[in-house]
Curated annotation (Swiss-Prot):
Its EC number is 1.14.14.19, 1.14.14.32. This is Steroid 17-alpha-hydroxylase/17,20 lyase. Belongs to the cytochrome P450 family. It is found in: Membrane. Disulfide bonds: none annotated. It comes from Squalus acanthias (Spiny dogfish). The keyword Metal-binding applies. Pfam families: p450. GO terms for cellular component: membrane. Its cofactor is heme. Heme binds at C445. Conversion of pregnenolone and progesterone to their 17-alpha-hydroxylated products and subsequently to dehydroepiandrosterone (DHEA) and androstenedione. Catalyzes both the 17-alpha-hydroxylation and the 17,20-lyase reaction.
């Protein structure tokens, strides 16, 4: 058995070495970006050995290799972009050319072979699916107003829970995550979860399991043949995906059983209606990307990405408000003067909340939820700047480096909402072009509008009622974070101290 295994490994190694040599010969033409040292079989992996997370390592390598450099990820040729000029060329100017996604073991498992939006193959079916999801975001009432009502409903429940804690030290993020999850559930399933619902707890467990394991299996994505050997992380990932799929499949079957043409009130029903229309028009549901697999994976994609993006961004907001009480106080003063205490905040207040808007922008700059965007792939021979980019090249955009570029931002590592205000204290969208918190172009994040609404409403609702601080005897939250699918903060405890002004509201009427 050991001889057979050794023979298999040698055979695979020979094939990969041959492919690597072929790839390097193919890349010999044109002006290519400066490349990290590369060796047969392993590519540039030796140059990537570091205690630094990938986004910080790429930022460090930028000083030696430039804003655009290349590397071999085993047999795969890739380029890393560290500045906004090249990033916007890829995402905007040449968005369709670079709209591809790499096929990788972990993402293929997550998406059943790219049958979703995040990892799906760019083409007519993918664009149709994306259009359907955008339709779902405009389901409730007049679009964003309906979504606002859902967010405020969850904010009410969340703040009531916090008031009952009576200043006790606790981890607030499970309650925040449930609120964010319920908004997504209403969009996808037209249902919500109570705090102690066992299914909700299961969903949180599998979601966290996916976040924890995907980033650890990068070698399997570089060398797919490793999946055939024992791997604890891959086993855990498969278990989490199986649990996710079991829950989503049940919801999908329930929707199919109860579907009627008048029930297009959530994403599953919108997808089912599109499938029925395609069948009535004798169109291929497979070509339209409307098989059962496509529909379940699209909902899984929106559900997973929507929850992790918004809850992670809000966690960073709380952490920085704790570390910068002067910023928190200034937001509270803005709330007090523009909203008061006789009503709760709403989206129509956004135009008067300059400092809160600036703070949200600064949070998304200094701690981008996804420091490395999902890799793109060149669908044809092309170029970035003055460099040749062959078809099939993987393109990694280092959003962290773009948001911490010393040439574009003054003191980029300092937390300063004022950088998004003009001389009169009015909010400006960005003081630099080096700002892409949700990506841009063809593959821009679908949940951008929802994430911004949740950040604005949840932050303003909480700060209207509470002051967020470190509980006595506890350390302040860590600002480093843990690299994975998202840049996730480490767990932390807070004390939500009820504001006197909120307690005394209405006493002087």
């Amino acid at each position: 058995m050991s001889l057979m295994l050794a023979a298999l490994i040698l055979t695979v190694a020979f094939v990969i070495c041959s492919l690597t040599g072929f790839t390097q010969r193919k890349l010999s033409g044109g002006r290519l970006p400066k490349c990290l040292p590369s060796f047969p079989l392993i590519g540039s992996l030796l140059s990537l050995r570091s205690d630094l997370p990938p986004h910080l390592l790429f930022q460090k390598l930028q000083k030696t290799y430039g804003n655009l450099f290349s590397l071999m990820m085993g047999p795969h040729y890739a380029v890393v972009i560290n500045n906004h000029q090249h990033a916007k060329e890829v995402l905007l100017k040449k968005g369709k050319i670079f709209a591809g996604r790499p096929s990788m073991v972990t993402t293929d498992l997550l998406s059943r072979g790219g049958k979703d939006i995040a990892f799906g193959k760019y083409g007519p079916a993918w664009k149709f699916h994306r259009k359907l999801v955008l339709s779902a975001l405009h389901l409730f009432g007049d679009g964003s107003a309906g979504i606002e009502k859902m967010i405020c409903q969850e904010a009410t429940s969340m703040c009531s829970t916090f008031e009952r804690l009576n200043n006790a030290a606790h981890d607030m993020m499970p309650d925040v995550t449930r609120a964010v999850t319920n908004v997504i559930c209403l969009l996808c399933f037209n249902s919500t979860y109570e705090k102690e619902d066992p299914e909700f707890q299961t969903m949180r467990k599998y979601s966290q399991g996916i976040v924890n394991t995907v980033a650890k299996d990068s070698l399997i994505d570089i060398f797919p043949w490793l999946q055939f050997f024992p791997n604890e992380n891959l086993h855990t990932l498969k278990q989490c995906i199986a649990t996710r799929d079991s829950i989503l499949q049940k919801k999908f079957e329930d929707h199919k059983a109860n579907y009627s043409s008048d029930s297009a009130n959530d994403l599953f029903n919108i997808l089912l209606k599109a499938k029925m229309n395609a069948e009535n028009n004798n169109s291929s549901v497979h070509e339209a990307g409307l098989t059962d697999d496509h529909m379940v994976m699209t909902v899984a994609d929106i559900f997973g990405a929507g929850v992790e993006t918004s809850s992670t961004a809000f966690a960073w907001m709380i952490i920085y408000l704790i570390h910068h009480p002067e910023v928190q106080k200034k937001i509270q003063e803005e709330i007090d003067s523009n909203i008061g205490f006789e009503r709760t905040p709403k989206m129509s207040d956004k135009g008067n909340m300059n400092f809160l808007n600036a703070t949200i922008h600064e949070i998304l700059r200094i701690q981008p939820v996804s420091p490395l965007l999902i890799p793109h792939v060149a669908l044809a021979d092309s170029s970035i700047g003055d460099y040749t980019i062959p078809k099939g090249t993987r393109v990694i955009i280092n959003l962290w480096a773009i948001h911490h570029d010393e040439k574009e931002w003054k003191n980029p590592d300092a937390f300063d909402p004022g950088r998004f205000l003009d001389e009169d204290g009015k909010y400006v969208c960005s003081s630099s072009e080096s700002y892409l918190p949700f990506g841009a172009g063809t593959r821009v994040c679908l949940g951008e509008m929802l994430a911004r609404m949740e950040l604005f409403l949840f932050t303003s609702w909480i700060l209207q009622r509470f002051t967020v601080q470190v509980p006595p005897g506890y350390p302040p939250p860590d600002k480093e974070g843990k690299f994975g699918i998202v840049l996730q903060p480490l767990k932390f405890k807070v004390q939500l101290k009820l504001r006197k002004a909120w307690e005394n509201r209405g006493l002087h009427d």
